Each structure stands twice: as C-alpha cells, then as structure tokens.
Amino acid sequence: MRTPDNDLPPPPDRYTCDGDAAVEARVARDQALIAAAVTRILTPPRFRALVLMGGYGRAEGGFVMHEGQPAPFNDYDYFIVVRGMGRAERAALEQTLARVSLELKGKVGVDVDFALLRDESLATADYSLINAEMLWGHRVVAGDPRVLAAMPAMPFAGLPQAELTRLMLNRGSLLLMNQRRLEAGEAISGQRLEIFFKFLFKAARACGDARLAGNRRYHPAYLTKAERLAGSDVAWPGQAEFLGLYDQAMEAKFHPRLARYEAAGADPRAWQGRMVQLWLDTLAWFEGVRLGRPIPDWEGYAAPTLGKGQGRDTLALPGNLARNLKTFGPLGLLRHARWALRHPRDRLISALPLLLANPGAAASPALADALGIAAGSPWVAASERFLDLWRRYS
C-alpha cells in the first residue's frame, strides 16, 4: 500500500490507493463517461472544468470485486466550475444535473454528486475543510487543469476548528439515521446492514479527523491520519477502543467487505452504542479544545449562548437572521429569540448530542429550543425535525 508524503499532494495518475491496473482502468472509464455526460449539456465559455474530489480525487478511492471484476465503492463527488451564469441559469442547470446524476448512477454503480462552483468566486473562496482538501488533492477530468489556481492558499494547520465541528455534525447525523432504524424496530440485515456499518465507520473516521485537528495535526490523506493517530501520545478519551474501531473503518474504506459483519453475527445495537459513545466523547473533547473550556454536559452545551462557530463573523449575522426567519417563521423567532442570530447549523450541532445520548426520550427544553419544537415532543418527531433541518443546512 502506498505511503503518501506528509507534505506533497497525492500522485496525479491514480484514483485508488492500491488498486491494480484493472481497478484504475475501471475508474478511468467511469470518469470519461461522466465527463462526456457533463460536457454534452454544458459547453465553454460557461463550462470551465469538471473537478473530481473526495477519495478518488486524492488517489484514495475504494473498490470492490464483483464476480472477479472491479467496481467503485465510494461515491463520485464533483465540483463543476462555471462562468458567467446567473442564479436562475444555475438553478436550471442543477435540475438537469440531478437527472443526469441518476442516469449515471445506473451506469457506474455508485452515486454521482455534482455541485456548482462559480469561477468568479474562486479568488474569495471560503477557508473551509472541503475547499482545503480539494486544493490539496483533486483531479480535473475535463476542462482547464489549472482552474483552481485562483483560489487562496488554505493550509491545514490554520483551518478553522469549527470546520471539524461541522464534519462531526454531518457524520453524527448518519448515526442518528442508524438510531432511527433501531428505534423503529427495523430488521437490519443484508444491504441495510451494510449501509448501517458504512455509516458507523464514516463516523469513526470523522472522530479521527477531529482528534487530529484538535492538536493541529489534521491531514487529508488517510494513511497519514492513521500513522498520526497511532503514534500520538495525547490522552484522548477511549483511545484504545477508538484505534481498534478506526482500523476497521480504514479497512472498510479501502477494501469494504461489510457483509462479513452479518456473517459473524454482529449486533447492530451494540455496535451503534459503542460508536455513539465514542462520537460523544470525541465531540466533548474537541469542543472543549475549540472553546478553551470543558463541556459541562450536553444540556449546557445546547445553550444558544455557547457558539458552535458556524456563520463565524459579524457580517454573517443578517444572513443568519434571514435564515432563521425563513425556516422558523416570525412566531418561531419570537419563541426562540436567543437563536435568532445564530446560524441554523449551530442549532443542529447543539441538538444532535442530546438526540444520540438519549434515544427514545422526549425532547428536553434545551433540545426543543434548539429545534424550534415543543418541549416533550416524542424522540421520533424530534429526530425527524432534526434531519429535515440538517438536509437544508448541513
């Protein structure tokens, strides 16, 4: 398995970490197919580039074997860089791309996700985790290979720590989806079990990211992450159990064989409980580092006076107010006025630990306040409200 240099970007000629020529050729064929589909509906000068992100863009994509033939395992994630397109034109293009992505999924076997990036905004792009990782490792599969050169430098050592809080929110939300299946009494087997474990391991990898970022040791390459986590002398909570889970999560990313957990009689509820506790412990530690003080408890953490770092500057306050007004309405704003100037993501970050720590419990006043619902609302309703908001503001 290749060991990436800690400073240099990933090799530009690979999509996977250790796939053979047949694996690489399969992913390359998929890229050509997807590029052809995009360039049929979008042409220069409006089209600037199709940029492959994520694991395949960083030469760390996963693969599986089906009847002796390689196939991708992870989603294909792209930014499409466009120029000179107004809001209405971009909205229309997004609708077309949604249809195209479904067609492509049927051909390549994994989700194909597109997001638009305006060429005019590159020079002032946000200093975010997704942008920093994209700059470090990406593949331009169609268009100008230097399209991202206009973006400012985004060193990982200076990455705003609230970006990792956001990552923990997004991966913790997958744990909430798992918990809803358990609370509903669903039979978790077959493909459902594979998805269940896929979500568990995504959360485990996010915990690794947060633990590294809390010590300014974050790196996008998974092999480097694993080395830094294993070699750390930091007394992280639950470190021994975490490293065991992280090793399995790493294997599941590169060489997924999730069906083996069903064959071994794995108990989904027990696995979920372990992962939720590690997620809660990691979030409490990381947020204590970010805020410079310990987290007293999850009820106290949910207070709107404790900022979660989303919508980070004063200029964002009018936008935060507008988002809350649009989402919760004038009456909701009055009832939960302390949240009015916080980004809605702050509400979600505040609510999620309470939902995961107390599955099945009625909404406490703090949880209800964050989600804009009535105290005492059933857990199922509160979790559904959370996921509705998360899909809008993740």
Describe these PLM feature segments.
Residues 86-94:
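Short, conserved charged micro-motifs
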Residues 250-253, 375:
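Solvent-exposed interaction patches of small proteins and small membrane subunits
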Residues 239-251:
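Polybasic, proline/glycine-rich intrinsically disordered low-complexity segments
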Residues 2-58:
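Helical scaffold of the NTase/Pol beta-like nucleotidyltransferase catalytic core
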